[in-house]
Amino acid sequence: MQYKDLRDFMSQLEQRGELKRVAAPVSPNLEMTEICDRLLRANGPAVLFEQPRRDNGDIYKVPVLANLFGTTQRVAQGMGASSLEDLRDIGRVLSVLKEPEPPRGLREAGKLFTLAKSVWDMAPKRVSSPACQEIVWEGNDVDLARLPIQTCWPGDAAPLITWGLVVTKGPHKKRQNLGIYRQQVISRNQVIMRWLAHRGGALDFREHALANPGKPFPIAVALGADPATILGAVTPVPDTLSEYQFAGLLRGSRTALASCITPTLSELSVPASAEIILEGHIQPDPNHPSGYQHALEGPYGDHTGYYNEQDWFPVFTIDRITMRRDPIYHSTYTGKPPDEPAVLGVALNEVFVPLLQKQFPEITDFYLPPEGCSYRMALVRMKKQYAGHAKRVMFGVWSFLRQFMYTKFIVVVDDDIDVRDWKEVIWAITTRVDPTRDTVMVDNTPIDYLDFASPVSGLGSKMGIDATDKWPGETTREWGTPITMAPEIKARVDQMWGSLFEEGPGK
């Protein structure tokens, strides 16, 4: 599915019946969450709330787009694919770009050249009069209360920006980083930027603070970017490829970029077709140990299904807001699976498989069950080749992609087990695992800060479960042989099946 920008994508969805408009007034304070939660659980359409209602009954001038990625099919379409299965092709492209191999012949050389040319052809282009700057708010006009920002759950601390595409650049880096981090509104022009220590934005900020102490850190936030750019920011793109270039590959057209208006943000480029852009800085604060303004964030209902603990994060002060005419505010909520992050996880799972198989050819399938909060549990199917092989694969998965450093549980099974069928996985665990021999415990590893089950915030343990058949060296006992029916008997019963239960004459 090809499209120009978010509006074009929405138009195509609406033509297919995958986007519905809600004309009735609906509040972004809790009501939208409940509506979208019901829609998502029913595999329902994306929704455009045309009249977001304030608490006093007034109507916001900006409509709200929600549940955009509420089905894996729409995620696939957003990534330029026609189906979930086609996402594996994207994974194969990324695996080649991540670790290209020397061609083994002219045909492979030609394919590699074609791929390289297609990547080169998708270099972003500059736009001098971008749609995202048709309207500009400055000074006292900068007021986040003018936007219909959702409050998702009853215990949430404040309205929360959820789909903001955060653009940063480290002082020693040539390329920008795109990341999606939630942002708590704390005043008319300030939000708390909740990025974890390992994320690209936090790393850029840390480098800036070391290289330029006491100087404001520039940030731009794009709201309502096109789906390819949004999804490119959560995909494991090789460091040699910019997310904007990758978005062009997905979309089938070069990403149009614009420079920020604020002079101190001149090095940051934003999607020219985005609906809304926030421009500003993290300001210095000599009274804080980091040297920069921080505030206590949360609590918020999160993808774990719980409210998270409060913690200190940088404050982003917004100097200027630019937008398209008649802008659309793109929003979501997170909660106990299923939610949009869980749906994204199922879709991106198909991108991960070829990347893993490039590094570990013995892996035949890989699955992140949505019940595992997107990434906390991984199920791996493999062709085992030697004793201890399953444990090697466990450690390989934990260390291969940054996304898997927070995976708490890995279960490895043989190639005869369908990792997408819980019944088979549980059968393998209960019949092929000895708890002492076949579990691997690793202490003091990185853990999601939202995981309150860990003894220390951000640091906890991992468990690997080897649910494969055991080879000599792993057991001294004779291993069991699975029960299977003889093929000729199954074929014979297939032939007679239709007549077995027919009622005869007189019955």
UniProtKB/Swiss-Prot annotation:
InterPro entries: UbiD, UbiD-like_C, UbiD-like_N, UbiD_bacteria, UbiD_Rift_dom. Pfam families: UbiD, UbiD_C, UbiD_N. Binds 1 prenylated FMN per subunit. Its EC number is 4.1.1.98. One of its GO terms (molecular function) is metal ion binding. Pathway: Cofactor biosynthesis; ubiquinone biosynthesis. It is a peripheral membrane protein. Keywords: Cell membrane, Decarboxylase, Flavoprotein, FMN, Lyase, Manganese, Membrane, Metal-binding, Ubiquinone biosynthesis. One of its GO terms (cellular component) is cytosol. Homohexamer. Belongs to the UbiD family. HAMAP family: UbiD. This is 3-octaprenyl-4-hydroxybenzoate carboxy-lyase. It comes from Cupriavidus metallidurans (strain ATCC 43123 / DSM 2839 / NBRC 102507 / CH34) (Ralstonia metallidurans). The gene is ubiD.
